[in-house]
From Swiss-Prot:
Low complexity bias spans: 108-140
Annotated segments matching region Disordered: 1-140
Homology family: Belongs to the sprouty family.
Keyword line: Cell membrane, Cell projection, Cytoplasm, Cytoskeleton, Developmental protein, Membrane, Microtubule
Domain remark text: The Cys-rich domain is responsible for the localization of the protein to the membrane ruffles.
Function field: Antagonist of fibroblast growth factor (FGF) pathways via inhibition of FGF-mediated phosphorylation of ERK1/2. Thereby acts as an antagonist of FGF-induced retinal lens fiber differentiation, may inhibit limb bud outgrowth and may negatively modulate respiratory organogenesis. Inhibits TGFB-induced epithelial-to-mesenchymal transition in retinal lens epithelial cells. Inhibits CBL/C-CBL-mediated EGFR ubiquitination.
Post-translational modification: Cleaved at Pro-144 by the prolyl endopeptidase FAP (seprase) activity (in vitro).
Keyword Cytoplasm: yes
Gene transcribed to yield this protein: SPRY2
Sequence ranges of Polar residues compositional bias: 1-15
Region (Required for interaction with TESK1), start-end ranges: 178-315
Official protein name in the record: Protein sprouty homolog 2
PANTHER family on file: PROTEIN SPROUTY HOMOLOG 2, SPROUTY
Amino acid sequence: MEARAQSGNGSQPLLQTPRDGGRPRGEPDPRDALTQQVHVLSLDQIRAIRNTNEYTEGPTVVPRPGLKPAPRPSTQHKHERLHGLPEHRQPPRLQHSQVHSSARAPLSRSISTVSSGSRSSTRTSTSSSSSEQRLLGSSFSSGPVADGIIRVQPKSELKPGELKPLSKEDLGLHAYRCEDCGKCKCKECTYPRPLPSDWICDKQCLCSAQNVIDYGTCVCCVKGLFYHCSNDDEDNCADNPCSCSQSHCCTRWSAMGVMSLFLPCLWCYLPAKGCLKLCQGCYDRVNRPGCRCKNSNTVCCKVPTVPRRNFEKPT
């Protein structure tokens, strides 16, 4: 009866009994010290534990032909995890205490989880730092790769003709002058300057004054008809339908007279052609730098001597 009265409360004998098979009551339990160490973890360590991903592989370096390939960090993590599994398991004392008290089981699981997470984060940071050192060491050790790095902004190369002064041969091309007007009589200067023209529509159509007149006065239709009706490949009547010096002059003019009844714009071709000749002459007179005299004498001018520059410093 007295023994039953003393053990009336079921939880009191469990608290008064010695822990872990005979440890005195005043002696500190190492598991309590471990729980205190867990609560000391800082917020940065917890974030590092949550942000680590052990299933990703870091950047690897392409192995050189003379060097052995370095082991992959992913296999190293796998071996560490395989060898570290027995370490993360709960000790036999915790498993023995779970049989007797159910209240200490969640605490031991949390302790083992946090400790395993901290160890895995430490291994991940160590392996990442070692892989970075391998990458940096291989990049700095490679001589040709380091020498091939461009460190200066490339400058545009100057053409030799831009800085080269005019030689005597270039000055001799314009040495022959006209006796009347004094202008140069070389082929480049006396060549007539045509009206400007340009290719449009992705360089498929030539835009010039002659083509504008041909399409505006419907002469392009006449040229197409003469081109398909002519049997001689060397016949150029399609290019100059109004020419009087080529063959089949009467036939061409008669055909154009009949077509002008259906295409009245053909009557504007000859006046437009005259305006084109006038514009061509004015443009050539303004832009041609050479001589335009027909019968004149040619005078040879001396090449001017260019004095040498003295680059010495004044005394």
